[in-house]
């Protein structure tokens, strides 16, 4: 059976693990920058220097990473999952 693919969690996890700086635009027009340190179903923790912001996901309009994020699985990841 095909594995479920959660785009949002995969995207945020790649940003978090690779420490890719992001710009987060909120629905009220506010913009903040930083690195995603953690996230759950409802919030994400954004860190910028010594400042931390806990942002509710329902308030987020757009997340723009500073570098390209490849969301598809690598060839070796797929073969490892098939072996299990």
UniProtKB/Swiss-Prot annotation:
Pfam families given in the database record: Hfq (PF17209)
Gene3D superfamilies: 2.30.30.100
Record-linked InterPro entries: Hfq, LSM_dom_sf, Sm
Domain of life from the UniProt record: Bacteria
SUPFAM superfamilies linked: Sm-like ribonucleoproteins
Biological process per Gene Ontology, one example term: regulation of translation, ncRNA-mediated
Positions of the Sm domain: 9-69
Keyword RNA-binding: yes
GO molecular function, one term: RNA binding
Keyword line: RNA-binding, Stress response
GO cellular component: cytosol
UniProt similarity note: Belongs to the Hfq family.
Subunit structure: Homohexamer.
Function noted in UniProt: RNA chaperone that binds small regulatory RNA (sRNAs) and mRNAs to facilitate mRNA translational regulation in response to envelope stress, environmental stress and changes in metabolite concentrations. Also binds with high specificity to tRNAs.
HAMAP family associated with the record: Hfq
Protein name: RNA-binding protein Hfq
Species this chain originates from: Thermosipho africanus (strain TCF52B)
Gene: hfq
